[in-house]
A protein has these predicted regions:
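Glycine-rich beta-strand-to-loop/alpha-helix junction loops that act as flexible
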Residues: 3, 48-50, 82-85, 224, ...
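A short, well-ordered alpha-helical element
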Residues: 32-41, 153, 158, 305-318
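His/Asp/Glu-rich metal-coordinating catalytic cores
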Residues: 44, 55-70, 74-222, 226-231, ...
Length: 427
């Protein structure tokens, strides 16, 4: 069982070469799950959604998946699948509401459970074992936090559930008790699991990228995890997929098959790391920012600190051309330090020393050390390009002579461009 492979991501921040390398790595992880299924003589290959990272994958990745499904079919392995929140269109006007998996289903490459509000079980018989398989594709217009099983109905005119020795349900949602609060767009509650037909005694879920397994109310519930690590943090989990054996008693020998993920490094630097003199704007007791005069009185006579770029360079020393890196810079800084921050050089270093560098400055905020005592959290606040533009225009207006109209026109144009760019990013 696998899911959350997120093939064909757009990755706009990567260079074309790195983008193709990352996409190839994601394909290799999916192929590893197929290899394992064939090598271990699996009879069912179950996919729990988000095969692709969006609804319009590249033709290259579509063809790759077609080849992998052909390998499974040639090995006599039945592929069953549902759609996830990434690869299911959010509107019926997009691709007729059909996800890319429908193409493979039309060619008999997999059995696709495309409905999001009704379970239509299918009966499979493998080596004398009758297995009822059902699934719910993600409903893209459902309210956040809703339960996909809350108003679900069962359409089983052939009595697949009644005839089956064991039942397998595929879902793409968080499971209550197996995810963190508000982690998933939708969450299956324990009450909904308990209300399921008892014939569906094995549940496989996608969406959460960490593998997990619990026995809940007589059912085996497995979160398959993702085949490649997609985010930073301990909650990301490890890469891999799930293997289990179905019997008349349910699922047995459930295990997580680990895959080697692309290396990652998460670096956090405070502004005090970049400008050690900023420590002088805090007292040792209260942590308050104090005025410039007090800071100067406390300032020891030391050699100049390393430049911010040198500090970043040291932190990136452990990265390799394979390392996906995030650098978070946090804390207070003066307006002069904000303008001194070598963003372009940091990004260039990241391109040279790592596979990619995500520079996160959301937790930077400005403060004026001459303004007197105040808490850092009540400073000027998060940096705004529009505020910086206003400050720059005011400074230029004081020093400019006879160029006010041109300055105002340039400022208006920049405001429009900045507002449009922030709107596109959803900020």
């Amino acid at each position: 069982m696998t899911g959350d492979n997120h093939l064909s991501p757009r990755l706009p921040r990567l260079t074309p070469q790195r983008r193709e390398q990352r996409r190839e790595r994601l394909c290799q992880a999916f192929a590893a799950a197929v290899d394992y299924a064939i090598a271990h003589h699996a009879r069912i290959f179950a996919h729990v959604g988000d095969l692709f990272d969006h609804q319009t994958p590249s033709n290259r990745d579509r063809a790759f998946v077609a080849g992998e499904l052909a390998r499974l079919r040639q090995a006599g392995i039945i592929c069953v699948a549902i759609g996830g929140n990434h690869d299911t269109p959010r509107m019926q006007t997009e691709h007729g509401g059909a996800g890319p998996q429908w193409v493979y289903a039309a060619l008999d490459g997999l059995r696709y459970f495309g409905a999001s509000d009704v379970l239509r079980p299918e009966l499979l018989e493998i080596n004398g074992l009758r297995i009822a398989v059902a699934g719910l594709t993600n409903n893209p217009v459902a309210p956040p936090g809703s339960d996909p099983l809350a108003h679900m109905r069962v359409d089983d005119p052939k009595g697949a559930l009644a005839q089956a020795d064991v039942g397998l349900l595929l879902l793409h949602a968080a499971i209550e008790g197996m995810s963190m609060p508000n982690e998933g767009e939708r969450t299956v509650t324990l009450a909904s699991l308990d209300a399921l037909d008892p014939g569906l005694n094995v549940v496989a879920a996608g969406h959460i990228h960490r593998y997990a397994h619990q026995r809940i109310g007589g059912r085996e519930v497995v979160v398959t995890g993702s085949t490649e690590v997609m985010e930073f943090g301990a909650h990301a989990g490890g890469a891999g997929f799930a293997w289990l054996e179905l019997t008349r008693e349910g699922a047995q020998h459930i295990q997580h098959i680990h895959l080697e993920a692309q290396p990652r490094k998460d670096i956090t630097l405070s502004t005090e790391n970049l400008w050690p003199e900023n420590r002088l704007f805090r007292t040792g007791v209260t942590g308050k920012v104090v005025g410039r005069d007090a800071a100067l009185l406390e300032a020891p006579q030391t050699l100049p600190a390393a430049m911010p770029l040198e500090t970043v360079m040291r932190e990136l020393a452990g990265c390799t051309p394979e390392t996906i890196t995030r650098l978070r810079i946090t804390g207070p800084l003066t307006r002069d330090q904000y303008h001194e921050l070598p963003v372009r050089e940091i990004l260039r270093l990241g391109q040279e020393r790592a596979f990619s560098l995500d520079l996160d400055t959301r937790d930077l905020y400005l403060f004026d050390p001459a303004a007197g005592d105040f808490e850092p959290t009540t400073g000027i606040g998060p940096i705004s390009l529009l505020d910086e533009l206003d400050a720059l225009v005011a400074a230029r207006r004081q020093s400019a002579s006879g160029a006010g109209d041109d300055l105002d026109a340039a400022a208006r144009l920049l405001r429009e461009r900045i507002s449009a760019a922030e709107g596109e990013r959803g900020q």
